[in-house]
């Protein structure tokens, strides 16, 4: 099992040149057409590089209402334009997503508003 894990680790860390060499060996010696596998392996490191880029879209997640539940319900109601019952249900159902796909400054502003009301909030 450890050998397979080490092999998988080596496979994931291959460079594009090494992936191309592996594709050639698989085709010539074993008759395997590795086109789809080569694309998947080559995309692995690129996907990791994309994750390093700064996020531009954030979700505001209410983790808990804290002690001042009423104030948090009011803040959620105003921020989301919800009715009182919907806002209360959202707060009671924590953890819950308050808003999705916000710009960084909007998300931080909403987070600050909810935290000032007493909520525990997280940006994802």
Curated annotation (Swiss-Prot):
GO BP annotation list: translation
Record note on quaternary structure: Homodimer. Part of the ribosomal stalk of the 50S ribosomal subunit. Forms a multimeric L10(L12)X complex, where L10 forms an elongated spine to which 2 to 4 L12 dimers bind in a sequential fashion. Binds GTP-bound translation factors.
UniProt GO cellular component terms: cytosolic large ribosomal subunit
Molecular function GO terms recorded: mRNA binding; structural constituent of ribosome
Ribosomal protein found in the keyword field: yes
Keyword set, alphabetical order: Ribonucleoprotein, Ribosomal protein
Protein's name according to its UniProt entry: Large ribosomal subunit protein bL12
Signal peptide: none
Entry keyword Translocase: no
Gene: rplL
Function noted in UniProt: Forms part of the ribosomal stalk which helps the ribosome interact with GTP-bound translation factors. Is thus essential for accurate translation.
Family of this protein: Belongs to the bacterial ribosomal protein bL12 family.
InterPro entries: Ribosomal_bL12, Ribosomal_bL12_C, Ribosomal_bL12_C/ClpS-like, Ribosomal_bL12_oligo, Ribosomal_bL12_oligo_N_sf
